[in-house]
Amino acid sequence: MEDCCDPLLATDASPRPESFSRSEKDIASRSRTVAMADLDSNCELSNDVDMEQSSPDLMKLEQSSDPVALDGKVVLGFSLASPDLVNCGASPDLPRGSYEDSPEFSKKRRFSTELSLENGIDGSTTTTRLGRKSQVVKFSAICQTFGYELSPESSFELPSPPGDFRESMTPVISINSGSISTDVTVEDVTFLKDEFFSGGESITTDAVVGNEDEILLYQTARLGNFAYKFQSLDPGDYFIDLHFAEIEFTKGPPGVISGLDLFSQVGANTPLVIEDLRMLVGREGELSIRLEGVTGAAILCGISIRKETTATYVEETGMLAVKGSTDTVLSQQTQENLVCRAEEEAEGMRSDCEQQRKEMEDMKRMVEELKLENQQKTRECEEALNSLSEIQNELMRKSMHVGSLAFAVEGQVKEKSRWFSSLRDLTRKLKIMKVEQIKLLEEATTYKHLVQDINEFSSHIQSRVKQDAELHENLKVKFVAGEKERKELYNKILELKGNIRVFCRCRPLNFEETEAGVSMGIDVESTKNGEVIVMSNGFPKKSFKFDSVFGPNASQADVFEDTAPFATSVIDGYNVCIFAYGQTGTGKTFTMEGTQHDRGVNYRTLENLFRIIKAREHRYNYEISVSVLEVYNEQIRDLLVPASQSASAPKRFEIRQLSEGNHHVPGLVEAPVKSIEEVWDVLKTGSNARAVGKTTANEHSSRSHCIHCVMVKGENLLNGECTKSKLWLVDLAGSERVAKTEVQGERLKETQNINKSLSALGDVIFALANKSSHIPFRNSKLTHLLQDSLGGDSKTLMFVQISPNENDQSETLCSLNFASRVRGIELGPAKKQLDNTELLKYKQMVEKWKQDMKGKDEQIRKMEETMYGLEAKIKERDTKNKTLQDKVKELESQLLVERKLARQHVDTKIAEQQTKQQTEDENNTSKRPPLTNILLGSASKEMVNLTRPSLLESTTSYDLAPLPSGVPKYNDLSEKENNPEMADQVHLPNKTGRFSICAKRIPSAPAPRRSSLAPTTSTSREMVYLTRPPLSESTTSYDLPPLPNGGLKYSDLIEKVNNQEMAEQVQIPKRIGAGRSSICAKRIPPAPRRKSFAPMPFIPITSTLTSPDEKSGANQVLCTSPKLHRSNGKTLTSILRRSIQKRMQMKPSPRQQPMRRGGGINVGMERVRLSIGNRGRLAHRVLLTNARKAGLKETPQKQERWI
C-alpha cells in the first residue's frame, strides 16, 4: 500500500479466512478507481476498491434513504447525511496523490464492514458488503475503501438497536490494554491483564481519567501499531466495545484526524467508548483486532467482547439469518443481481474513463501548442521591450545633453552679471580704501610712539625667555636624571626578582587524550598559587615553585602580562633572552609564536616594543633589525636566505667573539624593519623555512632550535647616549625518547643531535648552579650562542612547558627539575650595553700602538741579548778578578811568614837606630821651629794608636820635627787619580776618616803613583815598625827571600790570626790605604806594644835592601816621611780589624741566600767604593747595574767590596 498522508486511525477486526469451498454464485469483486479532483493536477484513475455484484433487490434498496422491507424482511438502509465521506484533495495540509487498499484486500477478497464515525459517536454506523465470510472493521477514509465516486450524501448507516439489545449478549472476554499487574472490574465487567496482543508498547499515567470505577482501566494503554488475536471462539455474532483515552500525545496533529481523533472528540485524559461493533466469527473460531496509526500512533485502553445468543446459521436454505430485534436475511439471488448491476456500472465507468482519458490527451496537446505560442509571443515581447529600453536610454542621453547646454548658458549669463556686480563693488571699495588710507596714516604716527614701549616690553620678554630657557635646561637635566633613576629602579626590580626568571605553563588535554580517558598528572588548582604539584595515582608526588605558573585554561594574554616588562628592558639597552623548554608536543611553539588569531610571546613582545618606541619618538631615535637562524644537526642555518640560494651553495656559519666580549655570527642576514607588520613578515618567513617533521609523539614536531634575534640601536636625543641591545627569542626543539617516538633514519639523527644539544644545555646549567670555574659553553652550538644570555650580562626568561598527561610523568619531572636548577642560578646584575663606537676607534689605535710596541719590544729583546753577552763578559772578568784576589791572598800569607823571619834580624838594628835617633833629637831640639797650632786635619778623626807601649820609661815629651821643605801645602789639593800628569806631584793626603787619640798629628809624606804591582826598591814603599822594642843592637838589614810557589796557605793565615800566640810571633800588616795591599820586597818586623800614649819621635830608617852600606851599618838615612809615621801608628788597629773581618767571613749568615744561578760575583744594584791611587783617597762612587732580567732573583743581602 502506498503511504497515505490522510491522518486516519484504522481499526481492523477480521477473523482468519475460512478453508471451506465456495459456491459458483460467490460474489466476485472487481476494483475500480476513484478520481480525485485537485486544483493543480489530475489524479489518474485506478482500480482501488472491490465492488461486489449485487442483486436487483439490493439495487432497488440502494435508491432509498430509509430502511424498508423487501419480501417481508427488513434490510439495511442508506443515509446521505454524512458529507465527510467525500475526500477533498485540495487541502493544503495534506499532500496530493492517489489512494488504494492493501494488496491483501484485493487478493483475498474478504468481506469487510466499513464503519464511518464522522457523524459522531452516538450511534454505530456501519457499511456492510457481503462476500466472503471474514469481516473487517476499519476506521479510515471512504476514499480508501471504495473505488468509485460517492455523492456527499452517500454513506452506510446501521439502525439503532432496541433498548434490550445488550441484555441478550453474553460477555466472552475483556482485556485491560497495557496492564501487567491486576484485573480491573468496571460495571460488572472484569477486564483481565493485557494478553493476546502482538506489537505496540505499554504506557501508564497517574492522571485521573473517567469516574472512580474507571480510573485503573484508563491509566494504562497500549500505544503504536499492534493487533489482538483471540482463538477458540464459538461461531456466531460477537459485539466489540473499544475503550479509548489519549493519556499520552500520539504524535498526530490535533484536529486533522479524519475518522477518529480522540483529542478533537473528547480531549486529553478523557475516556471515549465505541460500543456494539458487530463481528461474525466462522467455524475457525478466530477473531483478530488490528489498530494502525495512519498519522501518529494508535492508542487503546481496553477491549470488551460479547456474544449474541440469538444469532444462528441457516445452512439448509443457504441463507445467513441474524436474529435479534430486527432480522436481516440476504439471499443469494439478491446478491447475484447486485453483482450484475455492479458489473454493468463498472463497464460504464470504464468507458467514461476511457473517454475522459482521450479528452485529457487532447487537452494536453492543446496545452502544448499554447505553450509554444506563448513562448514565441514572449520572445517577441522581450525584443520589443529591449528596443523600447534602448530608445528610452537614447532619449534620456539627449535630454541630459540639452539640459547640460541650458545649464551652461545659464551659468554664463550669471557669470556676466557677477562680473558687473563685482566691478561696482570694486569701485566702491576703492573709495573706501582711500578713506582708510588716511586713517592708516594717522594710526601709523600713533604706532611710532608705541614702538619704544614695544621694544622695552620685548627686552623684558627676552629676559623672561632667557630665564625660562634656563629653567627648561634645569628641568631637562632633572628629567634626564629622573629617567635614568626610573630605569635603574625598574631594572633593579627585575634584578631583585632574579636575572633568570622561570615561568611554567601546562597545556590542556587534547581530543585524543580526552577520548581515551587519560587522567590528569598535574594538580590544576595548585597553579593559581604559583606552584606545580605532580600527581601520581591521584595523590601528590612532588611540588615545584616558580615565578609564575599558568594552568591549562590560561590564555596567551595572561602569559604575556608577566612577560611585558622585558620589552622595556630591551629599549633601555639591556640584552634579553626568552626561550621555551620542554618535551615534544607540550606547546612550546604555540607559546612563542601562537596562531594568526591568538598570537604568542614573540609577536606580543615586538608589538609592545614598537609601542614603547612610538611613545619615545620625540626623545629617542631607534633602529631595529631582525635575523632568524636555526641550529639543525649542530649546524647553524640562516632562515632568511632564499631557499634556492641555500640549496645551491649552503654556507657554513661560525660563532665569533667580538672585542667587547660578546658573541656574534658573521654573515647572517639582518633585515631592517620599521613596523610590527614587517617584523612579523620576517619572522613568518623564517618560521616557514624551519625544519619540521612528523613523529609518533607529535604530528608537527620541530626538528631544530629556532632563534630570532632582534637588534635595537638607540640614541638619546637629550644627552647623546647610544645603546645597542639584543632580544633573543628562542624556541627549543622538544626532548624525545628514541624508544618512545620510534624514529629511524634521518629522524633518528635529528633526535640524537637535539638530545645532545639539550644535554649540553643541562651541563651548562649544572655548572652555573654549582658556580664551577669552568662553564662548558662550547660543547654545543646552542650553548655557544646562548653564552651571552646565560653568562650574566643579560636578562633571561625561561618558559618550561609540561604535559598534563600522567603517561608523560617522567618527562614532566625531568623538565621541572631542570627548570628548578635554572631558577637557582645567580648571574649577578645585568649590564647596560652601550654603543662605544668612538671607544672602538681608540681601541684600534691602541692595537696599532701595541703592534708598534711589539716592534720596540723586539728591539729591546735584541738589546737584552746584547746585555746578556756583556754580562757574560763581566762574569768572565769577575772570575779573573777573583782568581787574582786569591793569588794576592796567597802572597799576603807568604808575607806574614817572611815578616816572622825578618823580625828577628832587624830587632837589634831598630834598637840601635832608636838610640841614635834619641840622641839626635836631643841635639836638634833647639834648632827645630815650633809646630804650627793649626792642624791639617781634624784631631778627632786622626787617631794614633795609644795601645802600643812606650819604648822608653821616661815621660819626657818630644817635640815633633818641622815639616821638610818638600812637603806640599794643604791648598794644593787636586785629583791625582784622574789626572796622570799630577801623578808624580806631591800633595797632602786626604782625610782618612779614622779616629785618632794622638795629641799631635804626624803628617805623612805622599808617595808617587805606582803603575805596577811588582815589588819596588823605592824607599817610599818601605814599612818601618817603631812600636816594637829592639831585640838587639845590631843594625844589619836582611834581604827577604823570594816567595816560593808553595808558600803559606790561606788556611794557615786564618789559623795564625785566630791563634793569639802566633799573632804575637807573626805580625799581619794591614793593607795600606783604603783596602790596598802593599807588596814590598822587604819587610821590617813590627815594634812591640807601647806602654805609654806619649808621641813617638822620628827615627831615621835606612833601606832594607841588601847593600854594602847596610852591611857595614854606616851612613844610615833618616826616614822623615809623614806617611811612614801614620802607618806605624795604625798597624795594630788594622791588624785587629782585619782579624775581625776574617772571622765574619768564616761564619756564614743565617739569612744569607744562596748564590745566584750562574755563579760569579754579585754585580747587582750595588754601590762599590773604588780607591785608586794614594791611600786614604776616596774614589767616585759609581752605580753599576747588572742588566739581568727581572725574573732572576736577587740576593736579599747586598755585599760591598772595597777594591
UniProtKB/Swiss-Prot annotation:
Disulfide bonds listed in the record: none
InterPro entries in the record: Kinesin-like_fam, Kinesin_motor_CS, Kinesin_motor_dom, Kinesin_motor_dom_sf, Malectin_dom, P-loop_NTPase
Gene Ontology MF term list: ATP binding; microtubule binding; microtubule motor activity
Binding site for ATP: 582-589
Domain of life per record: Eukaryota
Segments of this protein annotated with the region Disordered: 1-28, 907-931
Keyword Nucleus: no
The UniProt record lists the keyword Zinc: no
Recorded coiled-coil stretches: 336-395, 846-901
GO BP, sorted A to Z: microtubule-based movement
PROSITE patterns: KINESIN_MOTOR_1, KINESIN_MOTOR_2
UniProt entry keywords in alphabetical sequence: ATP-binding, Coiled coil, Microtubule, Motor protein, Nucleotide-binding
Bias type Basic and acidic residues, positions: 19-28
Example of a GO cellular component annotation carried by this entry: microtubule
One Pfam family this sequence matches: Kinesin
Domain Kinesin motor, residue spans: 499-825
Residue ranges of the TM segments: none
Entry-linked Gene3D superfamilies: Galactose-binding lectin, Kinesin motor domain
Family named by the database record: Belongs to the TRAFAC class myosin-kinesin ATPase superfamily. Kinesin family. KIN-14 subfamily.
Name of the protein this chain belongs to: Kinesin-like protein KIN-14Q
Name of the encoding gene: KIN14Q
